[in-house]
Each structure stands twice: as C-alpha cells, then as structure tokens.
Amino acid sequence: GSELSNHFPYINSEGIETATFTDNQSEGWIDPFMFHGALKSKATELGAEFVKGNIKSLSEIKAKTIISAAGCWTKELLEDIPVEPQKHTVFRVKCPKHIPEMPLTGDLTTGVYWRPEGKEYLAGSPKSVFDATDLEPAWDDFEELVWPALAKRIPVFEELKLTGGWAGYYDCN
C-alpha cells in the first residue's frame, strides 16, 4: 500500500495489500471505435468490400475453418456456439481536480475500474446483466456502486460529476 502511494499519491491505499503496475510506457488501451474505423479503412484499401443488407437465405458451407465476427450476436447465427451477450455500463465523469497522469485502474474489491479519457474519466460498473434486451445504461449503478468506490479509492473523486454514459455488450462464453 505505501509503495503504491509513493507512485500515485492521489490513491487511498488503505486496505490494499498488493498492487501491480508497470511504468515502462508500453501498455495502454485501445479506443474500439477508432480501431474499428482503422481496420475497415485498411481492409477497403486492400480490396475488401463491405456489403450491408438483409439475409435472404442460408445454406451450408463446408470449410476447414470459419471465423465468425458476429460477436454478441453469434448465437443468432450459430446456435451451437456458446456465446452470450453481457450488458455492461460505462460512465463518463469529470472532476474539478483533474489528475493527468492516472493509469487504467481496477479495484478488485469493488469490481469498479476507471481510466482517463481526455479531460474526463471513464468508469465501469461491476454489475453486468446477461440476457438484457435493452442497451439503456444502468444509471442507478453510478450512485449505488461506482461513485462510492471511486470516492473511497481516489478522495478527490468525491467532487466528480456524471457527464454521460452508455451501455454495450461484451461477448462472453
């Protein structure tokens, strides 16, 4: 705990016995929207054609290997593949006392994670829902689960304000 506080003085390390981190500047995260756009652009540049439309019929295809890119919707296409959508809510927050050098952080005691996103932060709810039929964010999770966990671990986050959020699916098997 004390060594963690030496590197990240804004963290309340009370109750933390073990923490891991790297400071070699070679780790990070990917913006999935931008990554998707970059992949699509490169594929188009290399001759791929993207066709959008409705499926009119299905037929059997024999192949040694099939790659499905259906993600969370795999079960609708391939019933036997055990992939289930799991709804997950992410909140966007702003804090008057911005901490510029904050790594992606996960608190395993609460399941809440957070990371910087420009001048704001993204924070994920630990509560996920299988078989959710809507993608409305679980707004109550912010007040009940996320904000208390953030404020406990990063005391200046007591002052943060919710600025947005969304829900999406993780594909789980």
Regions found by a protein language model. Name each.
Residues 5, 55-56, 165-170:
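Short, solvent-exposed loop/turn elements at beta->coil junctions and helix N-caps
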Residues 63-103:
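Central helical "cap/lid" subdomain
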